[in-house]
Design a protein with these regions (language model features):
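SAM-dependent transferase fold signal centered on methyltransferase-like domains
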Residues: 1-382
């Protein structure tokens, strides 16, 4: 296996040369995905912005995330790098020496859940636990929750985005116990479905969770949670579990405590997603601190990702797609800037959704959005 030194952030990693050449990178003999660098950039920034000095990279591979935290977050005292692949751990250990952080790292050859459950106990838990599997994280959630300290941070990634975005709804119901939506705000629904799954798993252990950062790409959805131990905290989390309803006929979206069959506006059959998280996905102060970390570390893409989330929770848990709305009206696509300007002129706030390629979030109801877009379309035709 030919190895190369690959620099990511301020950290030198030992990775197979083929991992930098093949797309997708091979999973054997060890796995490293260079395309996930943004995921790890954001992770470093959020970790640096929060309190705590112990970190568990529970699916470490060649050690990219754990080594970056050990190297780039100065207050970190102990980082556990866990993997079942002996060859991957050997590379992680060699890279730890290369970066001068081997003394603060511990290496464990173990299956993820077994290791995480072994860390249950007041003095054995971690301030940060990261779960980043290939596919669904559901099988690791209970162990990860038990291994995270009270007021610690649990970060969870899901890479089965086609499942979470509604391409395979039966698989989503089996894995996540929830129904997704395959529509223009499917990625936000995917984020909320993952958050809801984590909240329900935590509640079964009398633990609450509070999302502080959430982001997504075409390949993954990822949520950082503050862990809050206690039955009352669990009950508070469950109060943010609900359902989203979307009407394919008229485009109306609503949130409910339970499923609804018919659209409230047109009365036709609606589509439901859930149970999922309908509460806030971010905390502004955490985002601001993480953004400052990204700026100070010269990580422009991470800074852009974090900045795009500011203000997202001022709006309902869905978005409107401009192309979809214009198509529904039978008009040419109206410029995004004109829609924002028109909404603000009549007293509404709006922003680009950070979860989809296109789309806007607004506090205006959908009929008013349709009215504005229609008027702009007529004006453009003259």
């Amino acid at each position: 296996m030919k190895l190369v030194v690959h620099v990511e952030g301020r950290t030198r990693l030992l990775v197979p040369a083929v991992s930098l050449e093949a797309d997708p990178p091979p999973t054997s003999p060890v796995f490293f995905n260079p395309a996930a660098s943004l995921n790890r950039d954001v992770s470093v920034c959020v970790t640096a912005a929060a309190d705590g000095s112990t970190f568990c990279d529970s699916m470490t591979g060649v050690g990219a995330r754990g080594l970056r935290v050990a190297k780039e977050v100065s207050r970190m005292e102990r980082v556990a790098l866990v993997d079942f692949n002996s060859e991957a751990l050997k590379l992680a250990r060699r890279a730890a020496r290369l970066n001068g952080v081997v003394r603060k790292c511990e290496f464990a050859k173990s299956e993820t859940s077994s290791y995480l459950y072994s860390r249950y106990g007041r003095d054995r838990r971690f301030d940060f636990v990261d779960v980043d599997p290939f596919g669904t994280p559901v099988g690791q959630l209970q162990g990860a929750i038990s291994a995270t300290t009270d007021e610690g941070v649990l970060s969870v990634t899901a890479t089965d985005t086609a499942v979470l975005c509604g391409v395979y709804p039966k698989v989503a119901r089996r894995r996540y116990g929830a129904t997704p939506l395959n529509n223009h705000f499917g990625h936000e629904t995917a984020v909320r479905l993952l958050a809801g799954t984590v909240a329900r798993a935590a509640a079964s252990a009398d633990t609450g969770v509070r999302p502080v950062v959430a982001h997504s790409t075409r390949h993954y959805v990822r949520v950082f949670f503050k862990i809050e131990v206690g039955a009352r905290k669990a009950d508070a989390s469950l109060s943010s579990i609900g359902h989203l309803t979307w009407c394919p006929s008229c485009g109306e979206s609503t949130a409910h405590a339970s499923q609804t069959i018919s659209c409230e506006r047109c009365g036709k059959k609606a589509r439901n997603a859930g149970p999922l998280w309908v509460g806030p996905l971010t905390e502004t102060e955490v985002l601001r601190r993480a953004r400052r970390e990204a700026e100070g570390r010269d990580l422009p893409k991470a800074c852009e990702t974090i900045t795009a989330l500011l203000g997202v929770d001022d709006f309902p848990p869905w978005s409107f797609d401009i192309d979809e709305t214009c198509s529904r009206l039978g008009i040419a696509t109206v410029p995004e800037s004109e829609i924002y300007r028109s909404l603000k002129e009549v007293g509404h706030a709006a922003m680009r959704t950070p979860f989809e390629k296109t789309g806007l979030k607004t506090d205006a109801e959908y009929p008013e959005v349709v009215k504005i877009v229609s008027a702009l379309g007529r004006a453009a035709r003259g």
